[in-house]
Design a protein with these regions (language model features):
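Acidic, low-complexity, intrinsically disordered peripheral segments
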Residues: 7, 22-40, 320-325, 472-497
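Bacterial N-terminal signal peptides
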Residues: 7-14
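Bacterial Sec-pathway N-terminal export signals of envelope proteins
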Residues: 22-91, 97, 171, 200-203, ...
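Small/polar, glycine/serine/threonine/aspartate-rich low-complexity segments that form flexible
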Residues: 31-43, 89-123, 251-259, 306-377
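Amphipathic alpha-helical coiled-coil scaffold segments and their short linker/junction regions
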Residues: 51-55, 206, 210, 240-355, ...
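Sec/SRP-type N-terminal targeting helices
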Residues: 62-66, 79, 125-153, 204, ...
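Periplasmic alpha-helical coiled-coil/stalk elements that build and connect Gram-negative outer-membrane
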Residues: 155-273, 420, 424, 444, ...
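Short segments within alpha-helical structural elements
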Residues: 189, 215-240, 432-493
């Protein structure tokens, strides 16, 4: 096809300029279970619908969203580190042999059953501002992850925009191929009738036009294949099953083509304020500045409050009292002698039982409380804090370099895309003039050919020039449009309609 190489060049240049990672995203998305992906494509697919579906189904975007949610959890946890601690514990044990009974501090040789319970609480009063700086660090990290997520969405948006415009461009190319074939068909019919009527020297004109018409059919077949391939590419980004009978809306008219109203410097200044990758790089610098402050905080003492309540119980506690149920006085069988002679010795025997404390009484009576102020001063811990601080400094410096690199890259990219836009606009304007000139030239040539003034070779040459100019003009329109959309993105003005 005579214009297929030009279209391929257009797509390649546009992809390289915007530095999109469409192929990586498509490869990662293909790893998903496409059978379970939502198929939201109906009979008509608009550009906003395509962007929405692609963002929803893209694996890279979903992974970035999960990462952002993880950073949100870390941020929540950083606040919760400042809350008091409150813990409860309890246990029950069965002991055999010689066992210390903690309730009465005595030993028992029988089987014992004992238990304990405690509640403890603590509150950190000062920790070198570690918690406060960690909160700020996690907040910056969370914000950076949201910018990374938005960058992925923007990447998908631009990729879908490019693929959608490629479909519109290829559809226009197909329509042009049909129109070119129609014009040649009219001329071929006329010359065929002349040949059938025995007109003078129509044979060479007829064979030339037959060859031209056959070339038109080849161009149509190639245009159809190119259009279908561009549709397949779009559906691979959408991660849905391919549907051939989908209508694509074209909201682009000739009135959309005008000189872009901005300078490269203005675009760059806007981009510095809104591009997610730039924001993410700066936020990561802020985050690791706070990470350095966190690591330095471990040099300082930790002051905390602590308290606890504990109790225990056993199945063989010490008796609290005893109850006498009867008293007996009996002779012991022994005697003592005094002036009156031998006298019997009596013994007093009391019968009764011991009263042991109930479980609830043990739980209450054996309870103990404690409260204290604790100070922990780091003196020497394998130089862990020192090395952590050194590592934090290196990490911070690395992210500062990344931030600087991101800014320089953005400036170069904006300038390059701006120059490409200017070139695309000039090219479009030249093709407007060329198409108009070649169209008029073909009109005159067609009249002269119809009148038999010129031969078919002049007709075919003029028509070929006109056809190429129309094809190039259609492609140039979409090239310029995409260039302007990229610059709109840099300024936060990109609209998907």
């Amino acid at each position: 096809m005579r214009y297929s190489s030009f279209i391929l060049l257009f797509l390649s240049a546009a992809l390289c300029t915007t530095r999109l990672t469409a192929q990586n995203n498509a490869a990662a998305t293909a790893a998903q279970n496409t059978a379970g992906a939502p198929d939201a494509v109906g009979s008509t697919l608009t550009l906003p619908q395509a962007v929405t579906i692609a963002i929803k189904n893209n694996l890279i975007v979903n992974q970035s969203d999960l990462s952002s949610q993880s950073y949100k959890i870390s941020f929540d946890q950083s606040w919760e580190y400042m809350l008091p601690t409150l813990n409860a514990s309890g246990g029950q044990s069965l002991n055999f042999g010689r066992t210390l009974v903690t309730t009465n501090n005595s030993y028992a040789t029988s089987e014992t059953n004992s238990g304990s319970a405690s509640i403890s609480a603590g509150l950190t009063l000062f920790h070198g501002l570690v918690y406060q700086n960690n909160i700020r660090m996690q907040r910056y990290a969370w914000d950076a992850s949201k910018m990374d997520l938005q960058a992925q969405k923007d990447n998908i948006t631009l990729t879908v925009l490019l693929d959608y415009l490629a479909i519109l461009s290829n559809r226009d190319q197909l329509n042009l191929a049909y129109e070119q074939s129609r014009v040649d068909s009219v001329s071929l019919d006329r010359v065929t009738k002349q040949a059938d009527a025995g007109a003078l020297n129509p044979v060479s004109n007829l064979t030339d036009l037959q060859g031209q018409y056959a070339s038109d059919q080849i161009n149509i077949a190639n245009a159809i294949n190119t259009l279908e391939q561009s549709k397949v590419t779009l559906f691979s980004i959408l991660n849905v099953s391919y549907k051939a009978d989908v209508e694509y809306q074209n909201t682009i008219t000739a009135t959309d083509i005008s000189q872009y109203p901005a300078t490269s410097d203005t675009i760059f200044q806007h981009a510095m304020q809104i591009i997610p990758t730039i924001k993410s790089a700066q936020l990561k610098v802020y985050a690791y500045e706070k990470n350095l402050a966190v690591q330095r905080g471990y040099y300082y003492p930790t002051i905390s409050l602590g308290g606890s309540v504990a109790t225990n119980w056993t199945n063989i506690p010490s008796p609290t009292s005893s109850v006498v149920t009867s008293t007996q006085i009996v002779k012991s069988g022994n005697y003592f002698t005094d002036a009156n002679g031998n006298n019997p010795v009596y013994t007093i025997t009391q019968n009764g039982y011991n009263i042991y404390p109930k479980f609830s009484d043990q739980f209450k009576n054996d309870r103990g409380e404690s409260f204290g102020l604790n100070v922990s001063i780091p003196i020497l811990n394998g130089l862990q804090t020192r090395n952590s601080v050194r590592q934090a400094k290196l990490t911070l410096k690395n992210y500062e370099y990344q931030n600087t690199t991101a800014r320089h890259t953005l400036q170069q990219t904006v300038e390059s895309d701006f120059q490409n836009m200017m070139a695309a606009y000039k090219t479009y304007k030249f093709y407007v003039q060329a198409a108009a000139a070649y169209k008029e030239s073909f009109r005159v040539t067609n009249i002269r050919f119809t009148q038999g003034v010129i031969a078919s070779d002049a007709y075919i040459l003029a028509k070929g020039n006109s056809d190429r100019a129309e094809v190039n003009l259609a492609a140039a329109k979409y090239i310029y449009l995409f260039r302007t959309k990229v610059l709109d993105y840099y300024q936060g003005k990109l609209t998907i309609e």
